[in-house]
């Protein structure tokens, strides 16, 4: 069996590496991938995620059994619809089902209609109306670009002035282009955030271990929002009852609602949740695996990932099993300057062996192919599984202390919220 993973980051490295572990899989291609993936025996295909017709041609020519779609923008552009129209199987939602992610306003409408707990909100395309709403509600308050913005279109404003400025940047200064042509302004929710993922086909879903991501660039949750600087799973201090409540009040009604809307969901659904005094509420939905959460969830999967996805695609009941060992924790190493302007071309340390997995995101071979160089904002991620968060931290950080990370940076407090 040959498979295709579409995307190029650490998330796709983790997906492809896990698929390749299956005894039934002969080859896993990644389009376009990154050079670091080849160290794990993955084959790169030089086709960008936006070239749907070329990807379809490749899948047909290479007898690909099915494709796994990683990135949000490919899903929003209807890549799954095009694969299906060409008679090809793809694991991911259609464009209409993925609107849960590519329009925050649509997601809010679905939540209100199907009684899913979330923050109170208003949606605006007119700056003066948005400004009046912000001034009426006061701060703290959250301003979000309606469309996709690489995880950077959310501003948690501590003052009214800051919220108005963020709204001005989105609506009038076109900071995010069409993605910011509308803004969702919502109440600030107090509580602890966590991520809940599920494999989904229609009204059937299979919950994964909970995870906690670290979005801010620097220690102590300081600095600008990023795509994510590290994560761990499961969240040890989160009661099972909270997960059960989230499944009953959030996952089930949303998936049933999507069927009623004529947009049945297939793929991975990510619910970004916050545990408030009133129980779990939705901050956002993503229509795919998170990055970096994928890299710490998939190592915990003990069943055959390829068989699991094949069964879900075929409408069969998958046999999905997870390890109950301790915790899996990962730390992202990024280029200096990320998430703003960052440098490239920094030589990377050798790939780790043994208990520490290296997943590559922005990595490229030098011209003489002897060294891997940085070629993106987030460059690589080190992941390990241990009995406790503290042990996992010690393993990762002692390895990072040995590595030459000049020109790169990482947070030194990933997982610390779990140590109480």
Language-model regions, residue ranges each:
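Active-site "cap" helix and flanking loop/linker of ATP-utilizing ligase/carboxylase catalytic domains
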Residues: 247-269, 286-347, 351-355
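Solvent-exposed alpha-helices and their adjacent loops that cap or buttress functional pockets
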Residues: 21, 38, 91, 113-115, ...
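Internal nucleotide-binding/catalytic subdomain
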Residues: 157-292
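Short, charged, surface-exposed secondary-structure boundary motifs
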Residues: 38-41, 56-57, 99-105, 218-219, ...
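Active-site nucleotide/adenylate-binding loops and adjacent lid/helix of ATP-dependent enzymes
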Residues: 5, 102-182, 241-252
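ATP-binding N-terminal substructure of ATP-dependent carboxylate-amine bond-forming enzymes
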Residues: 1-94
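Peripheral (often C-terminal) accessory segments that flank ATP-dependent C-N-forming ligase machineries
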Residues: 310-420
């Amino acid at each position: 069996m040959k498979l295709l993973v579409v995307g190029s980051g650490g998330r796709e490295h983790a997906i492809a590496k896990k698929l390749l572990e299956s005894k039934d899989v002969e080859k896993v291609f990644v389009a376009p991938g990154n050079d670091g993936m080849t160290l794990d025996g993955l084959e790169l295909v030089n086709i960008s995620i936006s070239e749907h017709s070329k990807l379809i041609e490749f899948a047909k020519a290479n007898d690909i059994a099915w494709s796994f779609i990683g990135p949000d923008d490919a899903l929003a552009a209807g890549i799954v619809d095009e694969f299906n129209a060409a008679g090809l199987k793809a694991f991911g939602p259609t464009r209409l089902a993925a609107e849960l992610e590519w329009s925050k306003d649509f997601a809010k409408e679905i939540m209100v209609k199907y009684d899913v707990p979330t923050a109170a909100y208003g949606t605006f395309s007119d700056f003066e109306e948005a400004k009046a709403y912000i001034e009426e509600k006061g701060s703290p308050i959250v301003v979000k670009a309606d469309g996709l913005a690489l995880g950077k279109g959310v501003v948690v404003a501590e003052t009214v002035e800051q919220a108005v400025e963020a709204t001005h940047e989105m609506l009038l200064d076109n900071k995010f282009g069409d993605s910011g042509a509308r803004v969702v302004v919502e109440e600030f929710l107090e509580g602890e955030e966590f991520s809940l993922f599920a494999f989904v086909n229609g009204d059937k879903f299979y919950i994964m271990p909970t995870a906690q991501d670290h979005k801010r660039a620097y220690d102590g949750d300081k600095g600008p929002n990023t795509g994510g600087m590290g994560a761990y799973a499961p969240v040890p201090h989160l009661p099972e009852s909270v997960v059960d409540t989230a499944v009953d009040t959030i996952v089930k009604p949303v998936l049933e609602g999507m069927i009623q809307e004529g947009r049945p969901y297939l793929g991975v659904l990510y619910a970004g949740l916050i545990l408030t005094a009133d129980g779990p509420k939705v901050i956002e939905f993503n229509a795919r695996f998170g990055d970096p959460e994928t890299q710490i969830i998939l190592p915990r999967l003990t069943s055959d990932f390829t068989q699991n996805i094949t069964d879900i695609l075929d409408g069969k009941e998958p046999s999905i099993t997870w390890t109950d060992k301790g915790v899996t924790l990962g730390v992202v190493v990024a280029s200096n300057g990320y998430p703003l302007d960052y440098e490239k071309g920094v030589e990377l340390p050798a790939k780790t062996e043994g208990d520490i997995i290296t997943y590559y995101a922005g990595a490229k071979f030098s011209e003489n192919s002897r060294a891997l160089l940085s070629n993106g904002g987030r460059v690589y991620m080190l992941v390990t599984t241990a009995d406790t968060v503290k042990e996992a931290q010690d393993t990762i950080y002692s390895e990072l202390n040995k590595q030459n990370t000049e020109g790169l940076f990482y947070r030194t407090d990933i997982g610390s919220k779990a140590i109480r």
